[in-house]
């Protein structure tokens, strides 16, 4: 599987700071047991970045507060 790069994710979320926040929130959700939106056997942080790069997750993560 191809390596994920920040540049791939920045195409979807241009602001690096928002990218980090969105990936962090999504990784927390995955860690709490939410289903991944892509097939992945990686850790939650990598899976979150892959979802962002694939366009499955975006800035809407910033509107959700992980519980």
UniProtKB/Swiss-Prot annotation:
Domain of life: Bacteria
Catalytic activity: RNA(n) + a ribonucleoside 5'-triphosphate = RNA(n+1) + diphosphate
Keyword rRNA processing: no
Record-listed E.C. numbers: 2.7.7.6
One BP annotation, GO: DNA-templated transcription
GO terms, molecular function: DNA binding; DNA-directed RNA polymerase activity
UniProt record similarity statement: Belongs to the RNA polymerase subunit omega family.
Protein name: DNA-directed RNA polymerase subunit omega
Species whose genome carries this gene: Verminephrobacter eiseniae (strain EF01-2)
């Amino acid at each position: 599987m191809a390596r994920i790069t920040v540049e791939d994710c920045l195409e979807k979320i241009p602001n690096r700071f928002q990218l980090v926040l969105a990936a962090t929130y999504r990784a927390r959700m995955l860690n709490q047991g939410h289903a991944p939106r892509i097939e992945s056997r990686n850790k939650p942080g990598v899976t979150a970045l892959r979802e962002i790069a694939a366009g499955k997750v975006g800035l809407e993560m910033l509107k959700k507060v992980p519980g």
